[in-house]
Amino acid sequence: MKKRIPTLLATMIATALYSQQGLAADLASQCMLGVPSYDRPLVQGDTNDLPVTINADHAKGDYPDDAVFTGSVDIMQGNSRLQADEVQLHQKEAPGQPEPVRTVDALGNVHYDDNQVILKGPKGWANLNTKDTNVWEGDYQMVGRQGRGKADLMKQRGENRYTILDNGSFTSCLPGSDTWSVVGSEIIHDREEQVAEIWNARFKVGPVPIFYSPYLQLPVGDKRRSGFLIPNAKYTTTNYFEFYLPYYWNIAPNMDATITPHYMHRRGNIMWENEFRYLSQAGAGLMELDYLPSDKVYEDEHPNDDSSRRWLFYWNHSGVMDQVWRFNVDYTKVSDPSYFNDFDNKYGSSTDGYATQKFSVGYAVQNFNATVSTKQFQVFSEQNTSSYSAEPQLDVNYYQNDVGPFDTRIYGQAVHFVNTRDDMPEATRVHLEPTINLPLSNNWGSINTEAKLLATHYQQTNLDWYNSRNTTKLDESVNRVMPQFKVDGKMVFERDMEMLAPGYTQTLEPRAQYLYVPYRDQSDIYNYDSSLLQSDYSGLFRDRTYGGLDRIASANQVTTGVTSRIYDDAAVERFNISVGQIYYFTESRTGDDNITWENDDKTGSLVWAGDTYWRISERWGLRGGIQYDTRLDNVATSNSSIEYRRDEDRLVQLNYRYASPEYIQATLPKYYSTAEQYKNGISQVGAVASWPIADRWSIVGAYYYDTNANKQADSMLGVQYSSCCYAIRVGYERKLNGWDNDKQHAVYDNAIGFNIELRGLSSNYGLGTQEMLRSNILPYQNTL
């Protein structure tokens, strides 16, 4: 299991930013200039049996027991080197040992180094047999990486595995800077286990101690280690001052946990955020349980609620066992509809209208698969909490290709729908869908002829309340049988563009599809899981207008479209444009009176869609799309973006997105589409930028403006300073955080965050721009 990037627990030795490009690489190179490297040939294997070479100005001795060397003494064996003004060499026979024990005492300007560490001090001692080394009242410097300090006594033990410091200190800052350090009465650094143990630890900023712990165990490498991670703090208008102190628990090689006490001043309590990760034979998963024992703000706003406890449970699991079994969980549930408005959480957002709870178990072998699942929804709307869950649902697929010239498939589904309200209709639905295809293709085109039968049976219950309030009545037992016929043809033509762009290739890809589905009146079937599908270019060629099975629209239509692409001499797509339309010979209907455009009796060219992408250069890109629906009498949706991206840290993007109110009303559930905040649709223009503004300084910003409401929708500004041993990030965000139904206006939350990252024990020197961009409520999406 991959461990999160370690940060320095409580004393905070480590890093939490990742970037390997742009200025990050420059900063890493600059930092390594102040770090010594091992510049002698590296000797591999056991070096204890290698000869010892001694150079000095003067030498005298009592052979074979003792020798004294003075004047520029230089002793080498393997990768180890000891230098001093004077060295006394002692050699004694040890009982039971085949080789004599050779030790040295060094005096004056003692310098010891190997491929791991450099030790300096006035006095030293070394065992040439074991490489054990002591240096008194000196300092040390790691070789090839950041890390240095001082100690009353520095010891190398266990073939250089352990560095032991008595009354020592550590910092990853380069020489000449002690911005932060950790000191302790004893520090043991285990290189093999990549851990440092510190007794009586004090974390210092400059000369000032700000934190004490009697014992700390710190991760100093990539191995997973239990301990505190770096704390965080911020201020928001929703919760006022907030402080996080995460603790990482390495439970076992296949599981770990992060426990985070999260203090919120305005809430008057600590939320316990508990994340658990695991890896098993059935797959990998993550669980999160967040719990706030009481919330004084919630108590004031909801005096009639029995409890002010706030909680979230999240579980995600995905895995395969024995190559045939599939297990999937996507489960999110919160204590109340306001949870994501009050608390920032990576498993949900204030813009989410619901949370999903889904479990599924699947079985798959060649030509056959089956899945049993349950799906529920927790709706956050205060206007209508009605929602349907599938409890349970069975999906079965059987494929048999190459039956002569045909491919065949049978799809079956059985599902039971239950509503959260006891007065709403419920149903059991059984669907069977046999399909036969005749695929024909060559190197420049293909045509696929398909026929299928859509047979569905409904057994509906609990209809009295609905039928008493609607003129269109639901039937308890309904059978719906619909044949479907489709012919889909594609061609691909290409030509060299030698005249305009040597080495480039252009394609022309026309496509035409005829679809026929006869009309069946479905007004006696309640809509349990169907909604209008978005008609982008690829969506024009779908079989269905609606998702789900409750509404299958009739079709007698031809869809035509064309795509053109341009590839460079490296076969990289530089440009594409697609445009298409649906021409209806007869009106597309379901018989549902709630679908307003079915009363318009429109035919002809009704739906248009287009998409384009242009990679102008390695740094410039443009992407856009538009969908026009004459049934809605307007542009349904559109989006566009243009981006300049020099590297990971330097980018500027302008974007626009639009959704008409008619489209929202047709696609969203009624309790969302009729809400006040959607009455004018969505029309937002935005800008995102990230750029280093000075040496080691970078800035990130995002701004979105709602042109319908003539007000800001969301904004974010972050500034980060990065150095070799620490980084400081300050951020501000103003984001949409719900809708006030009483006052009929949007509610915003303002947040100011402050974060310190300590660096030096890994290769991470990123400027933090990608992290800040992804943290926005409208996250950055790459156009290139």
From Swiss-Prot:
Transmembrane segments: none annotated. Pfam families: LptD, LptD_N. One of its GO terms (cellular component) is transporter complex. Residues 1-24 form the signal peptide. Gene3D superfamilies: Lipopolysaccharide (LPS) transport protein A like domain. Disulfide bonds join 31-724, 173-725. Disruption phenotype: Mutations alter the permeability of the outer membrane resulting in increased sensitivity to detergents, antibiotics and dyes. Depletion leads to filamentation followed by membrane rupture and cell lysis. InterPro entries: LipoPS_assembly_LptD, LptD, LptD_C, OstA-like_N. One of its GO terms (biological process) is lipopolysaccharide transport. It is found in: Cell outer membrane. It comes from the Bacteria. Contains two intramolecular disulfide bonds. At least one disulfide bond is required for activity, and protein is probably fully oxidized in vivo. Induction: Constitutively expressed. Keywords: Cell outer membrane, Disulfide bond, Membrane, Signal. Together with LptE, is involved in the assembly of lipopolysaccharide (LPS) at the surface of the outer membrane. Contributes to n-hexane resistance. The correct assembly of LptD depends on the thiol:disulfide interchange proteins DsbA and DsbC, the chaperone proteins SurA and Skp, LptE and the chaperone/protease BepA. Incorrectly folded LptD can be degraded by three different proteases, DegP, BepA and YcaL. These proteases act at distinct points in the outer membrane protein assembly. Contains an N-terminal soluble domain that is likely periplasmic and interacts with LptA, and a C-terminal transmembrane domain, which is predicted to be a beta-barrel and interacts with LptE. Residues 529-538 play a key role in interaction with LptE. Component of the lipopolysaccharide transport and assembly complex. Interacts with LptE and LptA. May interact with LptE during assembly of LptD by the beta-barrel assembly machine (BAM). Also interacts with LptM, which promotes the efficient assembly of the LptDE translocon by the BAM complex. Belongs to the LptD family. This is LPS-assembly protein LptD. It comes from Escherichia coli (strain K12).
